[in-house]
């Protein structure tokens, strides 16, 4: 075999070519999307918001890959010109809009989609560009929705999927570990040490998206005006139904391929209020992802989702499976709205019960109202992303409750939720201030009897401790009581098991209870921490915290593209696409090539 050695003068040129090829390969695709939001009416004369003509109370699915750039232009036609010009603040808020990309972290603050805080409001007839690059570390199931008034329950929402090789490998490795097991037991899946030898595409895997939501027969703005913000308004208007994939009907079917061996279900609770319960009759659910975080595969029979939460589950089908009954319970004030849908294999003979009434949500196998914060654990790779320190520099405690005393009603015109005696609008004016790149424990104490779903913007959090209903508030200087005891027990559990705390962006906090969440403040800007029940948000239940920018690490504020175009059409030639921060994988490849070139050069000189 003839060996061709490179001359030294060839090495720099070869190196430049190879590095250019690598960087070009790492640059993702650019997706240019245009969303036109307008109001439409359903056959039932119910006013909804439609994005690009979609009428199922959900907008188009966005599907990208890690490292891709998204250029999304949103134009607002939600209200008529006459409605948009009304003096009422309630109308002004509803007639303006913005988009929040729920759970996408990291993302520069100017693209967080909070009108009047992180961006200008998008008024009637105006357009706004969201131009950013998905970070290489971001992967999984997310969703987008309006953060203006109560728009998203009317249809201003959709699913955002970020694909990546690590995700596909995680699914394939899990399949490799369970494919020869006849009966799957609840709990952590024992993963095979040998990695999968097949690509994910070699298996018969069918992916389906399942969106779950509550539903109100009346227009949300009417409900907000008449039943929530009035002087006698309450906190939780009764919803009338539920939606699965935007449909209110029961007994619908979802077709899958005849040769399907595994179902991969991305489930999103995109509702305004109700916790959702999900179950597949006779099948185990292998949980692979929670809120965009890949987890060590964990098997359950029934799972619940707080508003804003997402799970990806893998389902191993049986050889004789023709159809699967899907059971969904949408939690209302007293009980559940129960629906049953069916997955069926193409070509299968269907003889389905028309209106089966043998389901009690609370008697489903494995049913629990509790969060799986102790059970599920991020993969080793995911845990490295959250660079929290062992000991926080400070603990911030936030107590919230509902106030309907006369002084509150006189000041706000209605009863309001307050966090540490302040409403959300007051935190907008005067945020809680954190240091940059510091680790904090945030304690959220519910002095309210109801369960509340909380969501954090801009950061993931670790769940250090989570109380049960009735445990009471946790205060670090009160070292007694149920809350203190549970907190200590959770710390001992983490120390004894060596488990990493679960990482999420959304969580349910039980009534008269608490949560201790640990964050590292890496992203500068003003960020929200709020209840994701839309009515509660309108009633003041949330805070704003601010992370400062530092001169020595100012690039942290621009891990994504930084240009946006409020109200005016941009010149396409001037749109800047800034790549995400360089990832370790690229560095390793580049170093490897440098070493190989150096070895080649040494080899050449030795043989001269």
Curated annotation (Swiss-Prot):
Residues the entry annotates as binding Cu cation 3: 147, 457, 530
Cofactor(s) required for function per UniProt: Cu cation
Enzyme class: oxidoreductase
Annotated Cu cation 1 binding sites: 100, 455
Pfam families: Cu-oxidase (PF00394), Cu-oxidase_2 (PF07731), Cu-oxidase_3 (PF07732)
Ranges of residues in domain Plastocyanin-like: 51-163, 243-374, 421-548
Co-factor binding details: Binds 4 Cu cations per monomer.
GO cellular component annotations of the record: fungal-type vacuole membrane
Keywords for this protein: Copper, Ion transport, Iron, Iron transport, Meiosis, Metal-binding, Oxidoreductase, Repeat, Transport
Residues where Cu cation 4 binds: 452, 531, 536
MF-aspect GO terms: copper ion binding; ferroxidase activity
PROSITE patterns: MULTICOPPER_OXIDASE1, MULTICOPPER_OXIDASE2
Transmembrane spans: none
Example of a GO biological process term: cellular response to iron ion starvation
InterPro entries: Cu-oxidase-like_N, Cu-oxidase_2nd, Cu-oxidase_C, Cu-oxidase_fam, Cu_oxidase_CS, Cu_oxidase_Cu_BS, Cupredoxin, CuRO_2_Fet3-like
Known EC number: 1.-.-.-
Repeat keyword on record: yes
Positions bound to Cu cation 2: 102, 145, 532
Highest taxon, organism lineage: Eukaryota
Additional facts recorded: Present with 589 molecules/cell in log phase SD medium.
Family as reported in the entry's similarity comment: Belongs to the multicopper oxidase family.
Summary of the function given for this chain in its UniProt record: Could be an iron transport multicopper oxidase, which is required for Fe(2+) high affinity uptake. May be required to oxidize Fe(2+) and release it from the transporter. Essential component of copper-dependent iron transport. Involved in meiotic prophase and synaptonemal complex (SC) assembly.
Protein's name according to its UniProt entry: Putative multicopper oxidase GMC1
Taxonomic source organism: Saccharomyces cerevisiae (strain ATCC 204508 / S288c) (Baker's yeast)
């Amino acid at each position: 075999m003839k060996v061709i050695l490179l001359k030294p003068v060839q090495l720099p040129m070869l190196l430049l070519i190879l590095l250019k090829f690598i960087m070009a390969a790492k640059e993702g695709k650019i997706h240019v999307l245009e969303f036109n939001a307008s109001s439409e009416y359903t056959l039932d004369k119910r006013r909804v918001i439609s994005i690009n003509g979609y009428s199922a109370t959900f907008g188009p699915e966005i599907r990208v890959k890690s490292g891709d750039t998204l250029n999304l232009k949103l134009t607002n036609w939600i209200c008529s010109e006459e409605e948009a010009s009304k003096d009422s603040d309630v109308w002004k808020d509803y007639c303006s809009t913005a988009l929040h990309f729920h759970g996408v972290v990291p993302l520069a603050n100017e693209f967080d989609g909070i009108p009047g805080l992180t961006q200008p409001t998008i008024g009637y007839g105006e357009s706004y560009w969201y131009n950013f690059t998905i970070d290489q570390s971001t992967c999984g199931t997310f969703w987008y929705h309006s953060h203006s008034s109560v728009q998203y329950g009317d249809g201003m929402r959709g699913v955002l999927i970020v694909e990546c090789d690590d995700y596909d490998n995680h699914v394939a490795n899990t399949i490799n570990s369970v494919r020869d097991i006849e009966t799957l037991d609840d709990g952590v899946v024992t993963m095979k040490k040998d990695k999968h030898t097949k690509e994910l595409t070699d298996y018969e895997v069918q992916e389906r998206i399942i969106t779950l939501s509550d539903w109100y027969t009346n227009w949300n703005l009417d409900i907000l005006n008449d039943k929530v913000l009035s002087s006698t308004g309450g906190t939780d208007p009764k919803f009338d139904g539920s939606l699965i994939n935007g449909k209110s009907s029961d007994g619908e079917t979802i077709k899958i391929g005849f040769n399907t061996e595994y179902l991969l279900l991305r489930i999103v609770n995109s509702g305004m209020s109700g916790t959702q319960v999900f179950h597949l009759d006779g099948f185990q659910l292998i949980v692979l992802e929670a809120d965009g975080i890949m987890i060590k595969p964990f098997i359950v029979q029934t799972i619940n989702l707080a508003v804003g939460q997402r799970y990806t589950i893998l389902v191993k089908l049986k050889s004789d499976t023709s159809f699967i009954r899907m059971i969904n319970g949408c939690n209302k004030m007293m009980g559940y709205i129960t629906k049953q849908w069916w997955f069926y294999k193409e070509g299968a003979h269907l003889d389905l019960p028309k209106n089966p009434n043998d389901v009690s949500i609370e008697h489903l196998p494995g049913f629990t109202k509790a969060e799986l914060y102790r059970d599920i654990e991020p993969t080793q790779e995911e845990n490295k992303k959250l660079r929290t320190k062992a000991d926080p520099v400070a603990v911030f405690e936030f107590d919230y409750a509902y106030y309907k005393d006369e002084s509150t009603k006189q000041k706000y015109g209605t009863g309001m939720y307050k966090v540490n005696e302040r409403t959300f609008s007051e935190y907008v004016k005067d945020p809680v201030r954190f240091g940059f790149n510091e680790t904090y424990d945030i304690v959220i104490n519910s002095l309210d009897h109801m369960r509340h779903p909380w969501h954090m913007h801009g950061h993931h959090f670790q769940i250090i401790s989570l109380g049960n209903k009735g445990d009471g508030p946790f205060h670090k200087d009160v070292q007694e009581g149920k809350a203190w005891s549970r907190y200590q027990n959770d710390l001992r559990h983490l120390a004894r098991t060596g488990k990493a705390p679960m990482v999420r962006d959304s969580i349910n906090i039980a009534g008269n209870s608490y949560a201790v969440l640990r964050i590292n403040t890496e992203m500068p800007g003003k960020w929200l921490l709020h209840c994701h029940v839309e009515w509660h948000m309108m009633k003041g239940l949330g805070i704003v915290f601010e992370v400062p920018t530092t001169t020595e690490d100012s690039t942290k504020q621009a891990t994504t593209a930084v240009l946006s175009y409020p109200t005016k059409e941009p010149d396409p030639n001037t749109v800047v696409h800034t790549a995400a921060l360089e990832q370790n994988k690229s560095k390793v490849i580049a170093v490897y090539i440098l070493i190989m070139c150096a070895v080649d050069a040494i080899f050449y000189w030795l043989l001269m």
